[in-house]
Amino acid sequence: MSTKYVEVGELKEGSYVVIDGEPCRVVEIEKSKTGKHGSAKARVVAVGVFDGAKRTLSLPVDAQIEVPIIEKFTAQVLSISGDVIQLMDMRDYKTIEVPMKYVEEEAKGRLAPGAEVEVWQILDRFKIVRVK
């Protein structure tokens, strides 16, 4: 599991965070100062990368939050059997199996054996983002 920690105040829309052990993309961040002596708070709304669930988090701006390190690489489709796609990593030629539910909708129609795809590895899980 490759992650790092950053302050909540450094997050921007479009960045990625880990909420409840699930990697999420930040879709909205709202910062507000609570009062004269209170510290600023941030309300983060994020959508799960793998499950699409909306998650909300409210933390102080100076709190540390876990951010996943996303590794992007190219792979070649070896076979498509039912709901599992078998890929070959073009860096070290290892075989990877990715469930069909972890494929972006716009990439599903263009998947075929021999096609090269861009794969994201987030927290030891794989997602096919696009067909090259």
Curated annotation (Swiss-Prot):
**One of the GO biological process terms:** positive regulation of translational elongation
Compartments, as annotated in UniProt: Cytoplasm
- Modification type Hypusine: residues: K36
Q: What would you give as a GO molecular function for this chain, any one?
A: translation initiation factor activity
Q: What's one Pfam family here?
A: IF5A-like_N
Which InterPro entries does its entry note? Answer: IF5A-like, IF5A-like_N, NA-bd_OB-fold, Rib_uL2_dom2, Trans_elong_IF5A_hypusine_site, Transl_elong_IF5A_arc, Transl_elong_IF5A_C, Translation_prot_SH3-like_sf
Phosphoprotein as a keyword of this entry, yes or no, is: no
**Gene Ontology CC annotation, any one:** cytoplasm
User: What SMART domains has UniProt attached to this entry?
Assistant: eIF-5a (SM01376)
Its principal location?
cytoplasm
Alphabetically sorted, this entry's keywords are: Cytoplasm, Hypusine, Initiation factor, Protein biosynthesis
Family (UniProt):
Belongs to the eIF-5A family.
Q: Known HAMAP family for this protein?
A: eIF_5A
What the protein does?
A: Functions by promoting the formation of the first peptide bond.
Q: Identify this protein by name.
A: Translation initiation factor 5A
- GN (gene name): eIF5A
